[in-house]
């Protein structure tokens, strides 16, 4: 599955870069995040609890940032598995300064297997875009204030 998108921010590109790599901010804004621990090798251990329609559960995985060109570009590698299935993804992130802040363009290739794959690429693509949009909006909010809004009710449950 291939996904892409962009998000605009009122903060400058350096502040955006720092926010995207700040462990405490990430713990607050990653949808369904129950645990995020930075290891010595630069890799994160992560535990997420997410649900799509009737398929929900816990995913345990790893995230690593590579190909860093601060504050312009990085590649995020993520993999995880749990009772609903497994996910492996590579996401390319490009950051740009703009007149009124910054912009992030992203594209992601993801392999999804197990029960969660039975939901279908069309639904999963919509869910992934929704979660990415929520993540980027919450990054903006986290930088503006310490409080993060609770997730809206939808077919997507964050436990």
What positions do the PLM features span?
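Mobile acidic interaction elements
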Residues: 29, 35-37, 60, 68-73, ...
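A conserved amphipathic terminal alpha-helix motif
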Residues: 113-158
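A generic beta-sheet turn/junction motif
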Residues: 9, 50-54, 69, 82-84, ...
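Hydrophobic/aromatic beta-strand elements that line small-molecule binding cavities or substrate pockets
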Residues: 7, 34, 61-67, 78, ...
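Beta-strand/loop substructures that line and gate deep hydrophobic ligand-binding cavities in soluble
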Residues: 80-127
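Glycine-rich portal/gate segments that line the openings of hydrophobic small-molecule binding cavities
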Residues: 37-79, 134
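Hydrophobic ligand-binding cavity/cleft-lining segments
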Residues: 1-49, 158-159
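Intrinsic-disorder/low-complexity, polar/charged segments enriched in Ser/Thr/Lys/Arg/Asp/Glu/Gln
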Residues: 2-6, 43-45, 58-60, 73, ...
